Amino acid sequence: MSGGLLKALRSDSYVELSEYRDQHFRGDNEEQEKLLKKSCTLYVGNLSFYTTEEQIYELFSKSGDIKKIIMGLDKMKKTACGFCFVEYYSRADAENAMRYINGTRLDDRIIRTDWDAGFKEGRQYGRGRSGGQVRDEYREDYDAGRGGYGKLAQKQ
């Protein structure tokens, strides 16, 4: 049974795919595009390192029934590193999350959602050299919600 608050807002409109494509996708662009168009999985980015799985669930379950949440982890420290994947049971529920949750605030951060071709084991780890996300390696500004200064800026 779905208690999704946003289910009532459902429409027949289609949520467009963004220009972003996973550079590590194993397959060609056509195959990735096909998977993205039928996917029930969202990539959620710009999370605080302190955002919990429970907070993600509370927000994203307003769009429908969630099958699984996979928190992004620093591959060295195994701590949260600012992203996650949210998998819904239905495409319609995932579309509602894209429509209504993308660009909202969570933990004082504007989060972004994007379609994902489907979670595969190993993708929960950051791809940066230090184990976190690549963007956090090069950031020169101070961001308390994402561990302070970027990793490379800290070394200087």
Curated annotation (Swiss-Prot):
One of its GO terms (cellular component) is nucleoplasm. MRNA binds at Y20, Y43, R112, T113, D114, W115, D116, R123, Q124, Y125, G126, R127, Q133, V134. It comes from the Eukaryota. It is found in: Nucleus; Cytoplasm. Residues 40-118 form the RRM domain. Its main location: nucleus. GO terms for biological process: alternative mRNA splicing, via spliceosome; cap-dependent translational initiation; histone mRNA metabolic process; miRNA-mediated post-transcriptional gene silencing; mRNA 3'-end processing; mRNA cis splicing, via spliceosome; mRNA export from nucleus; mRNA splicing, via spliceosome. Residues 124-156 are annotated as: Disordered. The keyword RNA-binding applies. Keywords: Acetylation, Cytoplasm, Methylation, mRNA processing, mRNA splicing, mRNA transport, Nonsense-mediated mRNA decay, Nucleus, Phosphoprotein, RNA-binding, RNA-mediated gene silencing, Translation regulation, Transport. The keyword Glycoprotein does not apply. The modification Phosphoserine is found at S13, S18. Residues 134-144 have a biased composition (Basic and acidic residues). GO terms for molecular function: mRNA binding; RNA 7-methylguanosine cap binding; snRNA binding. The modification Omega-N-methylarginine is found at R146. The modification N-acetylserine is found at S2. It holds the Pfam family RRM_1. Gene3D superfamilies: 3.30.70.330. PANTHER family: 20 KD NUCLEAR CAP BINDING PROTEIN, NUCLEAR CAP-BINDING PROTEIN SUBUNIT 2. Belongs to the RRM NCBP2 family. Component of the cap-binding complex (CBC), which binds co-transcriptionally to the 5' cap of pre-mRNAs and is involved in various processes such as pre-mRNA splicing, translation regulation, nonsense-mediated mRNA decay, RNA-mediated gene silencing (RNAi) by microRNAs (miRNAs) and mRNA export. The CBC complex is involved in mRNA export from the nucleus via its interaction with ALYREF/THOC4/ALY, leading to the recruitment of the mRNA export machinery to the 5' end of mRNA and to mRNA export in a 5' to 3' direction through the nuclear pore. Component of the nuclear cap-binding complex (CBC), a heterodimer composed of NCBP1/CBP80 and NCBP2/CBP20 that interacts with m7GpppG-capped RNA. Found in a U snRNA export complex with PHAX/RNUXA, NCBP1/CBP80, NCBP2/CBP20, RAN, XPO1 and m7G-capped RNA. Interacts with PHAX/RNUXA, EIF4G1, HNRNPF, HNRNPH1 and ALYREF/THOC4/ALY. Interacts with SRRT/ARS2 and KPNA3. This is Nuclear cap-binding protein subunit 2. It comes from Mus musculus (Mouse).
